[in-house]
């Protein structure tokens, strides 16, 4: 499904499979074309095989976002098995309700701008997002989780607050890991104004890369966040390198 300006779902059921589904493991050519820049996943498809996409308007060169491209889920049930991003938007994304089960060879949820999960004061069940397989699970420039339950399995970063065409990652493969938090790894140098904020809800991350990776700051104000990180040279929490910080004022981490 592709919308030029805005995609909104208020109810109903969607079951989507694109190209070879989440089992895709190589480059392909042809089709509708790509989109914005690469994200470090060298095994991703070169065609547009996203599950749901709100593109937005770009300049004539196709490189500078101008308006629109918002994706909003207020309710309903979404099941996606995609070779490219399962949910993707060029503008802002709001996952405020509904149930989403996503499997992908690339990003589970990707926003080129702000990504909001749940409502302020919302319950822990709304929305429900289960990313069973992904390269990176949740990606946006500014990520805020207010409520709901999010479960992520990723072969790179679980949550990634980065630019719209971020190029981090090593294309690792991995699943649920054993053991504790482990030490902080080296990884790629990063810095910026991107943010990742947890105000409520439940977050479960199983990542072979960094569990929670922000090129800017990470803030914990409430909710429950559980991270299992399995890949060498990475860490459960990773913020930017230029006067950025991880701050805790509430919740359980």
Residue ranges and their predicted role:
Residues 1-253:
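A composition-driven surface/loop motif
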């Amino acid at each position: 499904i592709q919308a030029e300006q805005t995609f909104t779902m208020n109810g109903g059921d969607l079951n989507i499979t694109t190209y070879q589904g989440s089992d895709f493991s190589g480059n392909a050519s042809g089709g509708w074309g790509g989109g914005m820049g690469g994200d470090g996943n060298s095994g991703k498809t070169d065609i547009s095989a996203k599950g749901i996409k709100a593109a937005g308007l770009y300049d004539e060169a196709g490189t500078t976002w101008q308006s629109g491209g918002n994706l909003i889920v207020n309710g309903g049930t979404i099941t996606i098995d995609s070779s490219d991003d399962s949910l993707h938007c060029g503008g802002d994304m709001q996952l405020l309700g509904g149930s989403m089960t996503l499997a992908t060879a690339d990003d589970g949820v990707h926003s080129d701008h702000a990504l909001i999960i749940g409502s302020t004061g919302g319950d822990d069940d709304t929305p429900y997002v289960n990313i069973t397989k992904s390269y990176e699970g949740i990606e946006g420039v500014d990520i805020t989780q207010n409520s709901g339950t999010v479960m992520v399995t990723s072969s790179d970063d679980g949550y990634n607050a980065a630019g719209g065409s971020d190029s981090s990652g090593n294309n690792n493969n991995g699943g649920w890991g054993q053991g504790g938090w482990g030490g902080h790894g080296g990884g790629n140098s990063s810095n910026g104004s991107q943010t990742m904020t947890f105000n409520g809800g439940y977050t479960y991350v199983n990542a072979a890369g960094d569990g929670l990776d922000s090129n800017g700051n990470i803030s914990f104000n409430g909710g429950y966040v559980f991270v299992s990180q399995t890949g060498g040279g990475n860490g459960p929490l990773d913020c930017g390198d230029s006067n950025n910080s991880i701050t805790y004022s509430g919740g359980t981490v």
